[in-house]
Structures are given as C-alpha cells and as structure tokens.
C-alpha cells in the first residue's frame, strides 16, 4: 500500500463497501476514516481495526466475497498500480531474488495485489477462516509495526532462508521503522514526512515510484 500501488487497499476496500452499500454508509465511512488517520499517525490499534474491518466479511458467502473482491480490484486497485513498481518487481525477479509482500492489510484483500504482481509469498494480517466462513476475528498476530518483523523472521526460518546475503525492504510508512532496521537494505519509497526525516538521519536510500 502506497508503495507498489498509489493508495491504501485496506482504506479503498472500506470505501468500496460504503459506495456499494455493503455496509452502513455513514457510520462505516466515519470509522474507516478515523482508523486511517490513526494509521498515518502511528497510533492505530491493529486488533481494534481488525474487528471493525473483518466484520463485513462475515455477512456474505465466501463465493460472493470473491466476486466482490474481483470487482473491487478492477475498479479500485488496478488504476492505482504504478508502472515503476512493476518495473522494480521485475528487476528483482530477473535478479532471481525471492520476493514477499509484507502488509498490515488483511490477506483476503491483499492477495489480489500479490497475484497481480505474481508474488507468491504474502505476509499479512490473517482473518480467521473456519468451515468456509470468516469469523470476524483475527488469526494470530497483526502484521503491523513490530508484528511485521516477527512474521518476516518466521518466514525466513520456515523457508530455510537464513543464509541470505541481503534483505531489501521498500516502504512508504514510518510504521515500518522496526522492519527497516531489521533489513540490510531499507529503502523509503515516496515516504511520509516522518519516515523521510528518519531516512535522512539514517542515510537510508529514498526513491520514488510515482
């Protein structure tokens, strides 16, 4: 979000649900905006947001949700995909690097972007899914702030990748400082003001994909 695409897919998903009356337009939009502002400030409670954003997934049959998601991707996300981001992903693929998307956005929403970029490793917040239905609960730790580091470390261990030479990490958000500090090649992409200053202080590379 705001790195490979010019926008936030979690926020856009909420807007899409509102615009198509899958949720109560007024109350859901207000809360969606509130949570997004908290995210930008770095004060978001990810578990609270999970309960809010996963609840609509419990209302519909899974196949209906898949249809909604497909329309959402084509209408909302596809126009936000950055050509330079596609070039960057292809550069790493051609370099035989192992790619992963690490995102606070839940896996149901972020999977369509991962599929578009043909990146098979997706580390995301996981909505609980039991007997073919979403329960509205969070499964495991949120993939947010320090939680991203935990998920990346587990992914490295589980995929026998501990002998890596470098880990490149691209992000726009100061919420990802912990993961930037963990990785050997942190790169700020069109960073927010806070991350921009931190990147300058740490002499981290800053690029634009816009």
How should each PLM-predicted stretch be described?
Residues 1-41:
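Active-site neighborhood of HAD-like aspartate-dependent phosphohydrolases
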Residues 36-63, 122, 126:
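Short, compositionally biased "basic patch" segments
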Residues 8, 60, 147:
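Conserved active-site and cofactor/substrate-binding residues in soluble primary-metabolism enzymes
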Residues 14-15, 54, 184:
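Amphipathic alpha-helical segments within well-ordered protein domains
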Residues 7, 18, 45, 63-65, ...:
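Catalytic cores of transferase enzymes with a strong primary signal for eukaryotic protein kinases
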Residues 67-70, 74-210:
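C-terminal cap/substrate-recognition subdomain and adjoining C-terminal extension
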């Amino acid at each position: 979000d705001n790195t490979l695409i010019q926008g936030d897919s979690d926020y856009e998903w909420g807007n899409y649900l509102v615009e198509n009356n899958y949720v109560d337009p007024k109350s859901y939009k207000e809360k969606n905006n509130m949570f997004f502002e908290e995210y930008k400030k770095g004060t978001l409670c990810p578990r609270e947001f999970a309960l809010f954003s996963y609840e609509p997934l419990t209302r519909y049959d899974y196949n209906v949700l898949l249809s909604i998601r497909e329309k959402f991707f084509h209408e909302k996300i596809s126009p936000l995909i950055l050509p330079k981001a596609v070039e960057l992903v292809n550069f790493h693929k051609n370099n035989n690097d192992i790619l992963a998307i690490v995102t606070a956005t839940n896996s149901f929403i972020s999977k369509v972007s991962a599929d578009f970029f043909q990146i098979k490793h997706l580390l995301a917040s996981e909505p609980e899914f039991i007997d073919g239905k979403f329960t509205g609960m969070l499964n495991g730790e949120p993939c947010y702030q320090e939680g991203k580091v935990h998920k990346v470390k587990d992914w490295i261990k589980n995929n026998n990748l501990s002998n890596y030479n470098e880990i490149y990490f691209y992000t726009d958000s100061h919420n990802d400082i912990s993961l930037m500090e963990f990785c050997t090649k942190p790169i700020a992409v069109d960073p927010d003001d806070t991350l921009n200053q931190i990147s300058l202080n740490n002499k981290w590379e800053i690029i634009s994909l816009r």
